[in-house]
């Protein structure tokens, strides 16, 4: 197996040539320009300055960044408080059979307080990494990672430590023999998980959750709150779902999905469950309709671009509105309520401004989830504070995972682990039902793209083919020959006839090289080697003798072939 060593966060990450075992986002600090100065930024420059691509493989990608942009002042060192990661799991043969995926959102911060941000990031990152590193089911994992460690109890830390919290959206999926892929999903807070089929139709949504705190305030629960509550169901959205090969799982912090068109799924006096509008969401992927096998990065990029585009447009609308209100100096005119502001704008001919303000406040015109009741005296000062807070933005992270095709993973293992060819042979025999199965799998693998670096700014992303064409062509040829031979070895024929059929096949296939034949014989060994016991000489057959004669014949054929090749070169 071709291997590379990649240094990330001072840790050695062991990788194969086409995928990485584990990725987790590292600490990111960006320059956060004030809203007033940031209005002229176009989407491309906004993303290039603030977002990063973290790539595990064609099937697992993360885009992490921030739309934070404060009202008046630049913040030189603004820490991204989200974390996301993927840990791929394998069976005893090294074949990918599942993954653990998590995305965490550090709650609070973002005000330029470096000490506070560092502590929030620490909790966010450690929560994510602990989830990935645990080897238990999701319920046990959540229980374990929310238990305070002895080191934390002894630690003398700033007062912020006591109140530092993080929300989490996470899942584990695994391929169960005979049952297919099963996924365990958990959402604690305002992350959101959406499961799509391979045609981008929404199958399931693991909703975000907000808890009512009183005084009209709704906030997300956290892992820390989950650890201390007796009624965990009140804070946790938990689902176990059957998944299909090719399904796409998108997990996002609210800095991404909150910028899209949202939908209230359910509400009680104590809790809201929130998701995205399904009809709107499926339109995001119109450009991928004809793409045969888009990468997880392509999917993450499209959603991120749409979300940040809406964020910038919303921000520009708000800034323009705020400026128009402030230019009127209403405090000098004794205008103190929103109704008075609306009346003033209409009387003075600023009808468009009045309509914009009314739509934002009373009609959820920006789809940001905050609406007011009409015909109530609403203080202008309170609304101005609200409007300015809506321009701030948020840390924004998206993780896209595709459920792998098991045959693709068998082929990947066949390429990456040559020493396991013989062990994998019966798995191919059980899985492959036709040559078309192999053709489809190799076509998908030919489309796989991987980012050479684990992490890079989104403006610098570039991708390479995960496999060389000659590698796939050679492997497909060998496995196609194996399929034809193994299905053609009729067990109803006697031992001699089966060996004769195999010998005839190998001799007539001129494309087979010496190493190919040796590999095929190794893979077929369990099917053609002599049976032990009394049946070895059944009907007068001495299978050991026939087996040795067969191998001698093959060796002579290979020797003759080598001599012919040498003569042709003279």
From Swiss-Prot:
CC annotations in GO: extracellular region; host cell cytoplasm
Which Gene Ontology molecular function entries are recorded, alphabetically? phosphocholine hydrolase activity
Instruction: State which Enzyme Commission number(s) the record gives.
Output: 3.1.3.-
Q: Where in the cell is it found?
A: Secreted; Host cytoplasm
| Annotated keywords | Host cytoplasm, Hydrolase, Secreted, Virulence
Reading the lineage from the top rank, the first entry is Bacteria
| Catalysed reactions, semicolon-separated | [Rab1 protein]-O-phosphocholine-L-serine + H2O = [Rab1 protein]-L-serine + phosphocholine + H(+)
The top EC class, named as a word, is: hydrolase
Q: Name one GO biological process term.
A: regulation of GTPase activity
Record's InterPro entries?
PPM-type-like_dom_sf
Signal sequence region: none
What is the role of this chain? Virulence effector that plays a role in hijacking the host vesicular trafficking by recruiting the small guanosine triphosphatase (GTPase) Rab1 to the cytosolic face of the Legionella-containing vacuole (LCVs). Acts as a phosphocholine hydrolase by mediating the hydrolysis of phosphocholine to Ser residues of host RAB1 (RAB1A, RAB1B or RAB1C). Dephosphocholination of target proteins restores accessibility to GTPase effector LepB. Can act on both GDP-bound and GTP-bound Rab proteins.
What's the protein name? Phosphocholine hydrolase Lem3
């Amino acid at each position: 197996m071709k291997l590379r060593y990649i240094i990330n966060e001072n840790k050695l990450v062991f990788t194969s040539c086409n995928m990485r075992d584990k990725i987790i986002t590292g600490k990111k600090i960006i320059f956060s320009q004030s809203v007033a100065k940031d209005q002229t930024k176009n989407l491309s420059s906004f993303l290039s300055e603030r977002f990063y691509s973290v790539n595990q493989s064609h099937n697992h990608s993360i885009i992490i960044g921030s739309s934070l942009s404060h009202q008046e002042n630049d913040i030189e060192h603004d820490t991204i408080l989200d974390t996301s990661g993927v840990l791929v799991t394998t069976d005893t043969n090294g074949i990918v059979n599942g993954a653990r995926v998590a995305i965490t959102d550090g709650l609070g911060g973002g005000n330029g307080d470096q000490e506070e941000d560092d502590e929030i990031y620490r909790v966010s990152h450690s929560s994510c990494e602990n989830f990935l590193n645990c080897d238990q089911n999701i319920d046990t994992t959540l229980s374990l990672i929310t238990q305070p460690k002895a080191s934390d109890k002894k630690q003398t830390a700033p007062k912020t430590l006591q109140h530092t919290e993080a929300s989490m959206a996470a899942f584990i999926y695994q391929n169960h023999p005979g049952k297919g892929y099963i996924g365990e999903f958990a959402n604690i807070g305002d992350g959101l998980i959406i499961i799509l089929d391979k045609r981008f139709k929404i199958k399931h949504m693991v909703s975000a959750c907000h808890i009512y705190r009183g005084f009209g305030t709704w906030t997300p629960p956290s892992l820390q709150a989950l650890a201390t509550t007796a009624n965990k169901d009140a804070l946790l959205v938990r689902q176990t779902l059957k998944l299909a090969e090719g399904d796409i799982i998108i997990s996002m912090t609210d800095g991404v999905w909150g910028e899209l068109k949202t939908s209230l799924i359910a509400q009680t006096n104590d809790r809201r469950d929130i998701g995205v509008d399904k009809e709107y969401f499926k339109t995001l992927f119109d450009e991928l309709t004809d793409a045969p096998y888009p990468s997880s990065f392509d999917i993450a990029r499209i959603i991120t671009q749409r979300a940040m585009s809406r964020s910038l447009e919303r921000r520009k609308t708000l800034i323009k509105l705020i400026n128009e209100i402030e230019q009127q100096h209403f405090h000098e005119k004794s205008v103190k309520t929103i109704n008075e502001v609306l009346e003033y704008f209409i009387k003075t001919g600023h009808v468009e401004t009045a309509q914009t303000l009314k739509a934002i406040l009373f009609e959820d015109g920006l789809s940001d989830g905050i609406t007011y009741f009409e015909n109530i005296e609403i203080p202008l000062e309170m609304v101005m504070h609200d409007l300015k807070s809506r321009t701030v933005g948020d840390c924004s992270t998206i993780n896209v995972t595709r459920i792998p095709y098991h045959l693709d993973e068998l082929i990947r293992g066949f390429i990456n682990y040559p020493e396991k060819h013989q062990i994998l042979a019966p798995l191919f025999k059980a899985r492959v039902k036709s040559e078309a199965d192999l053709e489809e799998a190799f076509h998908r693998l030919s489309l796989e793209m991987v980012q050479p670096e684990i992490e890079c700014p989104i403006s610098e992303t570039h991708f390479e083919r995960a496999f060389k064409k000659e590698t796939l062509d050679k492997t497909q040829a060998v496995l196609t020959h194996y399929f034809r031979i193994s299905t053609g070895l009729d067990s109803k024929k006697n031992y001699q006839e089966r060996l004769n059929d195999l010998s005839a096949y190998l001799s007539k296939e001129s494309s087979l090289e010496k190493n190919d034949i040796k590999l095929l014989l190794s893979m077929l060994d369990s099917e053609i080697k002599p049976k032990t016991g009394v049946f070895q000489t059944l009907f007068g057959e001495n299978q050991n003798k026939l087996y040795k004669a067969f191998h001698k014949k093959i060796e002579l054929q290979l020797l003759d072939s080598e001599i012919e090749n040498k003569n042709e070169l003279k």
